[in-house]
Amino acid sequence: MMSVRPKTSQTYGHQDHRFCPTCGGPLEDGHESGFLVCKSCGRISYLDPKLAGAAMIEINDKLLLVRRGIQPAYGKWSFPSGYVNRGEQIERAVEREVVEETGLVVTADWLVGLYSEPDKTVVLAVYSATVTGGKLIAGDETLETDTFPYTQLPDLAFNGDAKIVEDWLGGRAKR
């Protein structure tokens, strides 16, 4: 089962915070906490992590993966995933991201785990999910979708992806 969309160029880049989100004043080093502080209003700019969600989806005894159409890891295989919007329930965010990236409607069933790495800005909540509808496509942020046998996965996009697969398979075996 495979779906492909046309190639499009994507750009990506992180910008350092340079201005205060409260007053627009310049941020500078020097606060005792190690974080940036606004020179104008004194607000400390904490660089809190961003929450993302991902789905582990089984289709015909295979794992659904998406080939990423955005950075980071453009062109690499990973799980349908994306950021949780402010005020959004994590499970609903996972379900929304799956629809956006694959066209499939899913229900987030159980939490596989929470994953983070030192010096990374993202905390990833991974759920096992069941397909309840939709049609498999490659969404706007996805180059293609495909299913793979668990023992024959392609090279995965991120360092922690293999551990996530291992945890998911272990969790499935216990259910």
Task: Kindly label every feature range from the protein language model.
Residues P26, G30, C41-I44:
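Cys/His-rich metal-chelating microdomains
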Residues I137-W168:
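NUDIX/MutT-family hydrolases
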Residues D48, Y115-L136, Y150, L169-R172:
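Active-site-adjacent beta-strand/loop module that shapes the phosphate/pyrophosphate-binding cleft
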Residues P6-Q10, E58-E100:
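Conserved Nudix-box catalytic region and its N-terminal flanking loop in Nudix hydrolases
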Residues L36-L64, Y83:
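Conserved N-terminal beta-strand and adjoining loop/helix that marks the start
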Residues E28-G30, L104-G113:
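A short coil-to-beta-strand element that immediately follows conserved catalytic motifs
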